[in-house]
């Protein structure tokens, strides 16, 4: 199904405003992405290119870059999130449960939401059987945590025209792949509606640090610039601001202080709270029922 068939165009200033409960002006949506990079394939991303520029397998340097995030960066971010009393949405490749069980146990012990991010970091277009991979991913996370994921992020936010129907069939209630609005939107599928929550590419460590290659302090300055605009607009309608972190990027020593300062300053404003994706979804569904 083409995206135009799944939702109608809706200018934001012509919709009835969404409202948060009394006392809440803006919701911060913190996300922590945990991935598995298979050394037998090209890496999902590169921090360093090989001599002569031709990628080789196995790509040990770039695999090690990501592996540092799981061995060190995650634990640094975990301490920061605990210190700030933030419960993020953890979007994870299901294979992380098998390869890094201590990481997922730490997330479960903190009560953090686990959201499915496929089995490992392979674009949905490359899968032989999307339906099987989606169900396998959800089954592993449910078996490991005791809870079936309600949300989904595709690897690299990838989808085919059929992916959303497979996700709805598997019981997924919300996605973060459709980065097209400041508010949640309801998408049609062949089975049941799925809600696209307002994710973004702008306050995202891969975009800022790995692709645009900004200095480390841009993690702070851009987040605050984004926040100031949304906080001002939130006087008229509910606003949600996502911040996406990956351990191999946000969890390194020269960035962690800037990430922490952004969270501290944003959450220090009156009426700002941090919610995970499931809580945002429940709020939105309740709003929709009242309309």
Regions found by a protein language model. Give the residues of each.
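Catalytic alpha-helical scaffold of carbohydrate-active enzymes acting on polysaccharides/glycoconjugates
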Residues: 2-195, 220-243, 249-291
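A conserved mid-domain beta-alpha-beta active-site/ligand-binding segment of alpha/beta enzyme cores
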Residues: 197-229
């Amino acid at each position: 199904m083409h995206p135009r068939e799944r939702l109608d165009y809706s200018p934001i200033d012509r919709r009835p405003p969404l409202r948060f409960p009394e006392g809440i002006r803006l919701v911060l949506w913190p996300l922590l992405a945990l991935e598995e990079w298979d050394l037998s394939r090209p890496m999902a991303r590169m921090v360093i290119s090989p001599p002569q520029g031709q990628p080789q397998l196995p790509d040990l340097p770039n695999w090690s870059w990501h592996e540092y995030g799981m061995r060190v960066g995650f634990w640094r971010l975990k301490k920061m999130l605990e210190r700030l009393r933030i419960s993020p949405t953890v979007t994870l490749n299901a294979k992380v449960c098998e390869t890094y069980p201590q990481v997922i146990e730490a997330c479960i012990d903190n009560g953090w939401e686990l959201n499915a991010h496929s089995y490992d970091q392979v674009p949905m277009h490359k899968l032989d059987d999307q339906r099987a991979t989606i169900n396998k991913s959800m089954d592993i996370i449910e078996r490991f945590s005791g809870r079936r994921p309600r949300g989904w992020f595709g690897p690299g936010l990838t989808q085919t025209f059929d992916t959303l129907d497979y996700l709805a069939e598997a019981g997924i209630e919300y996605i973060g792949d459709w980065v097209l609005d400041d508010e949640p939107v309801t998408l049609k599928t062949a089975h049941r509606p799925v809600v696209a929550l307002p994710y973004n590419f702008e306050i995202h460590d891969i975009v800022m640090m790995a692709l645009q290659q900004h200095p480390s302090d841009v993690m702070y300055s851009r987040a605050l610039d984004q926040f100031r605009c949304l906080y001002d607009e939130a006087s008229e309608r509910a606003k949600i601001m996502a911040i996406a972190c990956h351990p191999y990027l946000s969890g390194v020593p020269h960035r962690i202080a800037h990430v922490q300062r952004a969270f501290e300053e944003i959450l220090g404003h009156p009426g700002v709270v941090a919610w995970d994706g499931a809580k945002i979804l429940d709020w939105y569904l309740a709003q929709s029922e009242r309309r």
